[in-house]
Amino acid sequence: MMRIAVASEGLDVSNHFGCCTNFNYYKVIDNQLVDSRNLPSHGHLCGSQANFLRQIEVRVLLCGTISQNDIESMNKAGITVVSGASGNALQAVEEYLQGNAEQLVVHN
């Protein structure tokens, strides 16, 4: 099982990780979405988002843009950051899972 979080504003990917208001959270088994939730963002203090996402066992974070400091915090928490996502969060996850998102950049 894999857990993916999308830094979001409502149901859409947030333009910048630091400005996200919530996370759309997806559980994936055998490349199939089996559960989704909308979770509030827990502030943007140094490392707080990484700790929160680690606690809910997220392994991949999809986002629009993200600072190098946030990438490093996520990577230290064992979370792979994938930037360059946009549009609807669910569609971004589906494209990521299908390998159809050429605009995405993986940071790990």
Regions found by a protein language model. Name each.
Residues G18-C20, I56, K76:
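Short connector loops at helix/strand junctions that flank enzyme active sites
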Residues S8, G64-T65, A85-S86:
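Short secondary-structure boundary segments
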Residues Q68-N108:
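C-terminal structural segments of small proteins and small subunits
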Residues M2-S41:
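N-terminal first-folded block
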Residues A50-R54, V60, G64-N75:
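Amphipathic alpha-helical interaction surfaces in cytosolic regulatory modules
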